[in-house]
């Protein structure tokens, strides 16, 4: 029996794409394996957002080249596939640097994977075109489902932030129709999924065709998905502040299934740096938007992205970022040193910030963000949350799940609770997750 190993790097959309590639291969008779040494096909679904992520791929390819040679000596064939955004950006270079790679396929073409694998037996293949056909129309039914699932509703980005490669690797903004999204969501619900996360590079720019042919916004889509029987929870990511409209804010107040958690990247607190990044908003505009969202949903938990050391960033600029973090308060956040990406406007700037300065600023920012995260987790102790149980826990007799605010919880319970939403009292806050105890409905009330 043929086996496939799929490894994904980076964002939630990459996780979705990796799962769909596994489905495509499954429809061709491949079974999934967690052991790369056993795989007849190895797929690396790559991320190009930072240099470090791309170099990880090349390091992994070096190991796979050795593995491919060892399997060949045993009479076993191994096909190596590089997919995702590194593939899109560096297709020919990948094969030049690593001849062991058989297929390079971009994020819009992976529905062609079976054909590409067949062609690769004659010669190595690169497919990084943006095809006319919609890849979603060619994807098979999902084969493996859990309690929660990602669902791509929008791809690409038209914002062209000065540091970002996404518009070049994922293309212009494209939205799936409401009907197409609902059809996939209904299949997920039929398969036992209780929570759907609607994903896109700029998901709140969603403008898919609605039932009447007119463009629908993300708020319209959220309300439609919320009507599907069995779907108890809805989330969405990732958003841009400039596309956050009143309808979406109202949805947070009016749609019970829309969870009180929002990932809304700001990148910097300095207006000067935000302008240089081409973000087209200010720090105060972000603060005002957060105030409006919190007025609609006071218990909402916030997450964000931050870049330190963008070219030209001064100590005063960085201080503005720290001030914004203190003003807003975040449950969690992702923070990184600026990474030069070839082909982006920021890469050509001559005022790059020294590595040591970036490292010091990142450490200071992460210490502040960690203190906010730990305070948020400590405040959860003693409270009861509805937890969606997703899987078995770290230890025997435990299960693990997420609160509405996306906090991870471990607690003792039987595995038959997986897929259920149950009340859990938080008893302890750990460094990365909460611990709790299952309580009765009466006690929760």
Curated annotation (Swiss-Prot):
Cofactor stoichiometry and binding remark: Binds 2 [4Fe-4S] clusters. One cluster is coordinated with 3 cysteines and an exchangeable S-adenosyl-L-methionine.
GO cellular component, one term: cytosol
Catalytic activity as recorded in UniProt: N(6)-dimethylallyladenosine(37) in tRNA + (sulfur carrier)-SH + AH2 + 2 S-adenosyl-L-methionine = 2-methylsulfanyl-N(6)-dimethylallyladenosine(37) in tRNA + (sulfur carrier)-H + 5'-deoxyadenosine + L-methionine + A + S-adenosyl-L-homocysteine + 2 H(+)
Binding site for [4Fe-4S] cluster 2: 157, 161, 164
Source domain of life: Bacteria
Pfam annotation, one family: Radical_SAM
Main location group: cytoplasm
Entry-linked InterPro entries: Elp3/MiaA/NifB-like_rSAM, Methylthiotransferase, Methylthiotransferase_CS, Methylthiotransferase_N, Methylthiotransferase_N_sf, MiaB_methiolase, rSAM, rSAM_horseshoe
SUPFAM superfamilies: Radical SAM enzymes (SSF102114)
Domain Radical SAM core as annotated: residue spans: 143-378
Limits of the MTTase N-terminal domain: 2-122
4Fe-4S is among the record's keywords: yes
Name of the top EC class for this enzyme: transferase
Subcellular location: Cytoplasm
Binding site for [4Fe-4S] cluster 1: 11, 47, 85
Domain TRAM: 378-440
EC number: 2.8.4.3
CC cofactor: [4Fe-4S] cluster
Cross-referenced CDD domains: Radical_SAM
Cytoplasm among keywords: yes
Family under the similarity heading: Belongs to the methylthiotransferase family. MiaB subfamily.
Physiological role: Catalyzes the methylthiolation of N6-(dimethylallyl)adenosine (i(6)A), leading to the formation of 2-methylthio-N6-(dimethylallyl)adenosine (ms(2)i(6)A) at position 37 in tRNAs that read codons beginning with uridine.
Subunit field text: Monomer.
Protein's name according to its UniProt entry: tRNA-2-methylthio-N(6)-dimethylallyladenosine synthase
Species, as recorded: Methylobacterium radiotolerans (strain ATCC 27329 / DSM 1819 / JCM 2831 / NBRC 15690 / NCIMB 10815 / 0-1)
